[in-house]
């Protein structure tokens, strides 16, 4: 579950106050002429079902928890992509790609006889949707194949790039995912044009349905993604709807390099790129290829793939002007190349940027761009198809921004002065771009994986000791029980450690024990004062064990935190009359502060965690909506979310010891009391008079106050789908089932980042 859901051609607006699901036909939504902004308006066909949110927009949407079901995968539940990929002869694949790059096809000719620049753009735009605020987007899943990305204005004509690659995909089949193939092709393109890449890691599994991610509140492509204060709306990274980063003509099409620099810094920063990485990527990427604007997009270009006729077979942007391809190709409407050698890696982009004075002009397609003031540059660039023609180089407004912004200018000049520095910076920035969404290095596979640990990969130390055995685990459990730590303290700490995980980009989780490091140790949701108390006691247990004579066996604090949570759950289950053993697999390690980028980890901080009844007032979405968002990040299903909330409440595991939703007379006992008491019709619920978001449950006969609950608590009785699941767990015969299901869901969360176990 990588993103917000997409089921059928319906748009799910996560960012609206009620996460409205708006029903629209794909044809109406995605009929877009490249440079035009077509309103996205509702359109219905007879017989099309309306969603619940169509009739009741405030109704909680649970579809994020039903996304990417196993039933959608044609390869089957038993298929292991990693094992299949590891049987691949990567060298042979790269040779096949290299041949394809220089084998032009009549149906879509190659500029300068080389598809390399085209495929770099494909790989870049596939990976460039990643955004650090929520970890969504990126190359994994190959979402560029699906709506809406396959029909975004910024992805115009990349449908042809993927079709050109089909013979390679067809040849290697299930051994090579589209996600890996597109990134690998970008690497091979760079390498065949004289650039040494930093490396390549495989392991991206493909999705089989679109992610329906919140891309902005605008109802038109190219609409502004900024809020009323001019700030880029979080969690977005692109400045305008339908773009990967920024408008190359300038903000909202205005050719202002200074304003463009601000947009670039904000957009690239939202994808975890600093100024040096940003300049390296722009300068490196624009070393190659050309822009395409032979004529006006609005006059010549047809609908995007999602709105094209069925006979087009998934292709879009059909160009009716001239031959519609090659020298007549239209993509962005901008036209021209940045350098005189667009199919080889050089420093010409930087030389031209600083070597000429640039003036505004317009492309044949009517787009605003820049050309050298000096007429001597008019014959500098060869034509992509006709050797007898020459052209001046061109620049986008966003290129000129690198010259005008003081920080970007300083970096760009240093790259121009030192080409080796430029190469190294571009190699590392490109590697980060196309691997940023893959998570830690333990998820990297293949012979070209770099050996170096990079800070943005959230590195972990290697295990240098023997793992504890069952006897050791039993002994450690007894020591935890004797420590004086309570069930709620143990459960809260383990949950805080493990539930930092994001299924979107595979960051966070219990491995590394980063809950003891900045910034996690200071997050309000983790109750810093209590957390320190718990960690101090667990560390003393760890030290005593590791200093003892255990034949080289040691326990990490990361493992001990999870084991402590398990002990708490087991004790609570035993008190309920259902003794269980929570699964535990040692193997976690402890990161150090030097391996933990505070700024990078700050975006993982939960502003709401319904499982601990925590909600910060700064949130734009409701507590119930934020619960679903958090559950989707944890890859949970509706039943798993339900049983975990009910269990966490009776375990008294709320943040700050809040008693909201602790609907039991026996806190610390793993009973189904939360559901029994929530659904008890002898209790009447009403809004609390003094506190927004708090509800009071009074006895219907005596009016005595029984309970207090939050929106998150009451949603399990209010929402019809959640109530149906809650009724299962509230039933008299469900007490043991509740315990078993809670333990299974708990163990799932505790092991979300144990990629080693998942591969087994």
Swiss-Prot record:
Q: Where is the active site?
A: 125
Record-annotated membrane-spanning stretches: none
Q: What class of enzyme is it?
A: oxidoreductase
Binding annotation for heme b: 286
- Residues annotated as signal peptide: 1-45
Post-translationally, this protein is described as follows, namely:
Formation of the three residue Trp-Tyr-Met cross-link is important for the catalase, but not the peroxidase activity of the enzyme.
Q: Which GO terms describe its biological process?
A: cellular response to hydrogen peroxide; hydrogen peroxide catabolic process
**Keyword terms of this UniProt record:** Heme, Hydrogen peroxide, Iron, Metal-binding, Oxidoreductase, Peroxidase, Signal
Q: Which reaction does it catalyse?
A: H2O2 + AH2 = A + 2 H2O; 2 H2O2 = O2 + 2 H2O
GO MF annotation terms: catalase activity; heme binding; metal ion binding
Recite the UniProt cofactor note for this protein: Binds 1 heme b (iron(II)-protoporphyrin IX) group per dimer.
Sites marked Transition state stabilizer: 121
Record-level GO cellular component terms? cytosol
Chain residue numbers at which the record places covalent cross-link Tryptophyl-tyrosyl-methioninium (Trp-Tyr) (with M-271): 124-245
Keyword set includes Ubl conjugation? no
InterPro entries referenced in this protein's UniProt entry, alphabetically: Catalase_peroxidase, Haem_peroxidase, Haem_peroxidase_sf, Peroxidases_AS, Peroxidases_heam-ligand_BS
- For this chain, the site of the Tryptophyl-tyrosyl-methioninium (Tyr-Met) (with W-124) cross-link is 245-271
Give EC number(s), comma-separated. 1.11.1.21
Q: Which cofactor does it need?
A: heme b
Q: How does it assemble?
A: Homodimer or homotetramer.
Task of the protein: Bifunctional enzyme with both catalase and broad-spectrum peroxidase activity.
Family indicated by similarity: Belongs to the peroxidase family. Peroxidase/catalase subfamily.
Q: Any idea what this protein is called?
A: Catalase-peroxidase
Report which gene this protein is encoded by. katG
